[in-house]
Amino acid sequence: MKQFMDEDFLLSNDVARTLYFDYAKDQPIFDYHCHLPPKEIAENRLFKDLTEIWLAGDHYKWRAMRSAGFDENVITGNASAYEKYQAWAKTVPLCIGNPIYHWTHLELRRPFGITDTLFGPQSADKIWQECNELLQQPEFSARGIMRRMNVKFSGTTDDPIDSLEYHKAIAEDNAFDIEVAPSWRPDKAVKIELDQFNDYLEQLERVSDTDINSFDALKKALLKRLEHFDQHGCKSADHGMEIVRFAPIPDEKELDRILRLRRSNQALTELQINQYSTALLVWLGTEYCKRNWAMQMHIGALRNNNTRMFKLLGADAGFDSIADRTFAEPLSRLLDTMDQNDELPKTILYCLNPRDNEMIATMIGNFQTGGVAGKIQFGSGWWFNDQKDGMERQLQQLSQLGLLSQFVGMLTDSRSFLSYTRHEYFRRILCEMVGKWVVNGEAPNDMNLLGNMVKNICYNNAKSYFK
């Protein structure tokens, strides 16, 4: 019987262990997509206690606590920090079988060094005191944790109207050598069907000093913001796509009419919504291509399912799930439209429904081109798939239908500074998969070949892709 989460956790053979400890373990972290608040990095936030750094904003944990029967007051409500922590301590032992159980113990090991204690009600007080003392030390500030976890790059998620003042402050601080770059997330401008679309365009008008009275004026306003992001080191755009929309792009006159209708609060047809979305996405893709930005598309979430809780807590509070819409044809036509003039940017496609894995893994092969290895990527297991089975499925299907060796690897996609341990989780799973290939005679026992591939997937490929 193996010890729980020992040094060889998830590594069942000598090849896997060699790949992990000699090649993967000490690779830096290039975290190209996350939701960390840049303000907290700029100000080098010190966290008051474990609740602040561990539970605030973590909807994975919130969902588990709700499933365990805890009242919302001790999850997102007005209960004290210690009461929320105690509720979490009572929840964790109920999470065996869920990746949260592994993540929780990894997050205590790194950076806090707690390796010999199971987390639960019996150990909660001791861990609370020990970790809270550490959190008051500079090494456990926001920047300190990033350094301890060997982070080299962090790509935050930012709206076109954001000032990027904190990114500027970070870049100008010579005492901090980790690159923190904004990522362009223009969903509120692209999704013309949203109730808040007109309010958002008014904000965009103010920050861009542009009267948005036509589709061309909208592009000019966004172009000013694109240039602002580019000046602040942006390397990537990100699109959350519940629905992949496509329609042949109409002429500018029709796009102006669609925008005028929406700005006067008139209802649009599904065709008009699709025409607007396609036109704007294709134009944005061209602009990304000019700047050598990567375009990330997160496809297939069914969001804000619980109306009562959405009214109480808003979005991103743990009430989203996997959608089951099909999107192969509109995605293909959207990418093809960008590619017809050789203006398809580097692209990473993520699907939330694992049913779509093979479709995405084959779709990326349609648009690979010379000059950029792995130009179109099948993104790492996302959200509900960033667990052992989900990561294995994505890695296996990518290796079977594409080139695993060109994969840009893992990302945290997280709001927590403790989530960097997900890179360790991914690296162990990757090394175990490749190690099994060798043991089964499916890959050569060539550590130079396989070790370099592992190092590239863990760090080098992403570093090259987002240059």
UniProtKB/Swiss-Prot annotation:
It is an enzyme of class 5 (isomerase). Keywords: Isomerase. One of its GO terms (molecular function) is glucuronate isomerase activity. SUPFAM superfamilies: Metallo-dependent hydrolases. The keyword Isomerase applies. InterPro entries: Metal_Hydrolase (IPR032466), Uronate_isomerase (IPR003766). It holds the Pfam family UxaC. Its EC number is 5.3.1.12. It catalyses: D-glucuronate = D-fructuronate; aldehydo-D-galacturonate = keto-D-tagaturonate. GO terms for biological process: D-galacturonate catabolic process; D-glucuronate catabolic process. Pathway: Carbohydrate metabolism; pentose and glucuronate interconversion. HAMAP family: UxaC. Belongs to the metallo-dependent hydrolases superfamily. Uronate isomerase family. This is Uronate isomerase. The gene is uxaC.
